[in-house]
């Protein structure tokens, strides 16, 4: 009986205290907050956007460069960009810091934790993971009603796109991030998940690096039916049309050179479904050109 009581006491000790908030992040680290976060620092543009989507935009006291959506995010104090200003972060006295596992330096995250800050890491690896991120943020910020509703709407829209496009005839796709160096994504990157959602196949899915450099010769050998470019802004990059010199490429011969605004596909946020839908429409157009 004593052994049973001791076991129960140990189990209860491992549970969050009454009112305490417990969440496990993508790294497996357990996050504990005594109360919903009121002062949050975001270390990535996509996290800033997720915070607003989860109803916690008014809790954000600092963020990084390129956090530009929604428009209110542009007004937030900056704490660095690729390199973080740790002093500025500490000065904001956050009760929660939300970081990007693959985008923030490991040493910087470790230093923030050593300084006594609570750091939760985000890394949606598949489109469906965005909904879970919204729910976790809602729990940490105490905005579950808004966050859960946003997650539900996201899952429903994702299911609709999957039902419409994922089983369509396959289309070989080359997704170009940049020109110099010539860069793409592998099969584990979330953009590849969008390609699969649309019934496409990433021709460089097998490469081991998330954002590998490739050669023009490798692209020609892969002979994609569609080339999709992102770039850095909201307008079609001039270098997308550089592919027209390679007239033997199926994508060129059929005029399947497309652009999707990078913020819609390269940020792990609810807007990724806007980008995915644009991509799906492009791939459907490419299917319509077969046999012509």
Question: Where are these predicted regions, by residue range?
Answer:
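Bacterial N-terminal signal peptides
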Residues: 5-14
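N-terminal hydrophobic or amphipathic helices and topogenic motifs
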Residues: 17-39
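Extracytoplasmic substrate-binding proteins
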Residues: 20, 29-30, 96, 100, ...
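Short helix-initiation/N-cap motifs at beta->coil->alpha
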Residues: 24-28, 77-87, 207-216
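A short, structured surface patch at a secondary-structure boundary
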Residues: 38-92, 96-102, 203, 231
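Short secondary-structure boundary segments
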Residues: 44, 101-102, 177, 207, ...
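His/Asp/Glu-enriched short active-site or ligand-binding loop at hydrolase and phosphoryl-transfer sites
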Residues: 64, 188-211, 231, 259
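Short helices/loops that flank or line small-molecule/ion binding pockets
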Residues: 86-93, 115, 214-223
């Amino acid at each position: 009986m004593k052994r049973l009581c001791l076991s129960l006491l140990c189990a209860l000790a491992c549970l969050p205290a009454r009112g305490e908030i417990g969440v496990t992040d993508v790294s497996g680290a357990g996050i504990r907050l005594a109360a919903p976060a009121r002062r949050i620092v975001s270390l990535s543009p996509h996290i800033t956007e997720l915070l607003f989507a989860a109803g916690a935009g008014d809790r954000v006291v600092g963020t990084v460069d390129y956090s530009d959506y929604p428009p209110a995010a542009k007004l937030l104090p900056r704490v660095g960009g690729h390199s973080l200003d740790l002093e500025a972060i500490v000065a904001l006295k956050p009760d929660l810091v939300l970081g990007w596992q693959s985008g923030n330096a490991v040493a910087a995250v470790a230093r923030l934790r050593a300084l006594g800050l609570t750091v939760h890491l985000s890394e949606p690896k598949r489109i469906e993971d965005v909904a879970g991120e919204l729910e976790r943020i809602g729990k940490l910020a105490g905005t579950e009603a808004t966050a859960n509703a946003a997650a539900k709407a996201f899952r429903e829209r994702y299911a609709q796109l999957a039902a419409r496009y994922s089983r369509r005839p396959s289309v070989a796709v080359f997704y170009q991030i940049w020109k110099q160096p010539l860069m793409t994504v592998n099969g584990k990157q979330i953009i590849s998940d969008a390609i699969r959602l649309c019934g496409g196949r990433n021709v460089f899915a097998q490469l081991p690096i998330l954002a590998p450099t490739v050669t023009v010769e490798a692209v020609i050998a892969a002979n994609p039916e569609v080339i999709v470019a992102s770039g850095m802004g909201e307008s079609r990059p001039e270098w997308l049309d550089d592919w027209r010199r390679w007239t033997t490429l199926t994508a060129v011969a059929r005029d399947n050179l497309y652009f999707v605004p990078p913020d819609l596909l390269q940020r792990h946020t609810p807007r990724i479904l806007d980008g995915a839908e644009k991509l799906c429409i492009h791939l459907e157009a490419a299917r319509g050109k077969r046999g012509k």
